[in-house]
UniProtKB/Swiss-Prot annotation:
Hydrolyzes diadenosine 5',5'''-P1,P4-tetraphosphate to yield ADP. It catalyses: P(1),P(4)-bis(5'-adenosyl) tetraphosphate + H2O = 2 ADP + 2 H(+). Belongs to the Ap4A hydrolase family. Its EC number is 3.6.1.41. Gene3D superfamilies: 3.60.21.10. It is an enzyme of class 3 (hydrolase). It comes from Yersinia pseudotuberculosis serotype O:3 (strain YPIII). NCBIfam families: apaH, PRK00166.1. Keywords: Hydrolase. This is Bis(5'-nucleosyl)-tetraphosphatase, symmetrical. One of its GO terms (molecular function) is bis(5'-nucleosyl)-tetraphosphatase (symmetrical) activity.
Amino acid sequence: MSTYLIGDIHGCLDELLALLAQVNFDPQQDTLWLTGDLVARGPASLDVLRYVRSLGPAVRMVLGNHDLHLLAVYAGISRNKPKDRITPLLDAPDADELINWLRRQPVLQVDDQLKLIMAHAGITPQWDIETAQMCAREVEAVLSSDSYPLFLDAMYGDMPNNWSPELTGLARLRFSTNALTRMRFCFPNGQLDMICKDTPENAPAPLKPWFDLPRLVDPEYSIIFGHWASLEGKGVPEGIYGLDTGCCWGGDLTLLRWEDKRYFTQRAFKAEAEINNNNGFAAGEEVQH
């Protein structure tokens, strides 16, 4: 029995299957953790969702900002952009079923036995584990409820960007969503910066990557995240693992086998990298909430 953690798939099904074949993944025995952004930009978002859903309890995933954007597009709140390449999913006969499954997936995973925490963007330095779990449960509750379109309509925006226990309602949900699915840089006090998308070495002062600030999360826990392809998994402190290595931009799909901390990679198939590059995508370009 092995625990495998994989970075952002972004509709790259062939690379996912090739990567899982490298480690002889067995859904009857193994557990697969996915950092979110299953969909968009790659060629096979529909088939990725079908495959991941078919794995049932073998999968522990979190939602990413592109997954949330898909939900908003399907609900008629946001516009379907051709570069996201999700039209086959939107038009699929099982789209309702897949969307209803997707919106019931978590935005945070915590395993107290393995001492693992996973969120698409990471954990804001303003939260301890208990606060992160509380805020994640609030987002998950509204996403799985009948009022989820109201939340999806309100999630777009960069404010508030500073955590306070006094936050309530949609403002609180928006902060939590941004912290869990969009965050990269923070100010020294932990306040989110939602503007800079650069690499850490090119970020203006006083911004720092969220993982370089003192954090409230128990240091016995490791944090797994995706979202930030331009990091290429490098430059993170001990106990922090960035697994998005930009497969849909022509990079790799990366897998970490937790038991021995061994990495496996599958290079993007050239045709898909060329399609995205020719469309003028910037590595790590994200949906704007």
